[in-house]
Amino acid sequence: MAQLYYRYGTMNSGKTIEILKVAYNYEEQGKGVVIMTSALDTRDGVGYVSSRIGMKRPALAIEETTDIFGYIRDLPEKPYCVLVDEAQFLKRHHVYDLARVVDELDIPVMAFGLKNDFRNELFEGSKYLLLLADKIDEIKTICQYCKKKATMVLRTQDGLPVYDGEQIQIGGNETYISVCRKHYFAPMITSNKEQNYDN
């Protein structure tokens, strides 16, 4: 039985590397996959899944009006798996489409993304994936400032923490930092060389 998986983690937890690894493993066995990502992620161009270590693959860019279910249903060859990056940016109807791909087409879907935003609120896509997914798994990484597990994303601007503003602002390491709860509320924003890992 196919299932809907949601694998979430903070920034730099290896979500995209995991997608690329899963795709490689399927394709190594001659089993085709469909890779998708949000059109909102323009860091490396629209329609690419790209990791911070330099691995990159083309992907179907999911726009507001994309009919994910119809796209997968109408493919000439049924894929063995659908992989979705930046799933936090999906809309409610996209997540319901992913559930239909699993339930009606019997194709497993693995969605990867952030759980909460810099305000510590759920993204729309994350909210519905947490509600609908058959299996939920956390991809762990450590806090930028200590040895604890990072569970939150801190937005910084001009070296200062930001707790209010627009939910979606595409950036990289210079804008967002993965932190534990303690350092979300009391960040130690310094250069990497000055970090104190004893906290």
Curated annotation (Swiss-Prot):
Binding sites annotated in the UniProt record for ATP: G9, T10, M11, N12, S13, G14, K15, T16, D85, E86, A87, Q88
CC terms in the record's Gene Ontology section: cytosol
GO terms, molecular function: ATP binding; thymidine kinase activity; zinc ion binding
Transmembrane segment boundaries: none
Compartments (UniProt record): Cytoplasm
InterPro entries referenced in this protein's UniProt entry, alphabetically: P-loop_NTPase (IPR027417), Thymidine_kinase (IPR001267), Thymidine_kinase_CS (IPR020633)
Alphabetical keyword list: ATP-binding, Cytoplasm, DNA synthesis, Kinase, Metal-binding, Nucleotide-binding, Transferase, Zinc
SUPFAM superfamilies in the cross-refs: Glucocorticoid receptor-like (DNA-binding domain), P-loop containing nucleoside triphosphate hydrolases
Active-site residues annotated for this sequence: E86
Cross-referenced Pfam families: TK
NCBIfam families per record: PRK04296.1-4, PRK04296.1-5
Protein name, entry field: Thymidine kinase
Species, as recorded: Streptococcus pneumoniae (strain ATCC BAA-255 / R6)
Gene, per the UniProt record: tdk
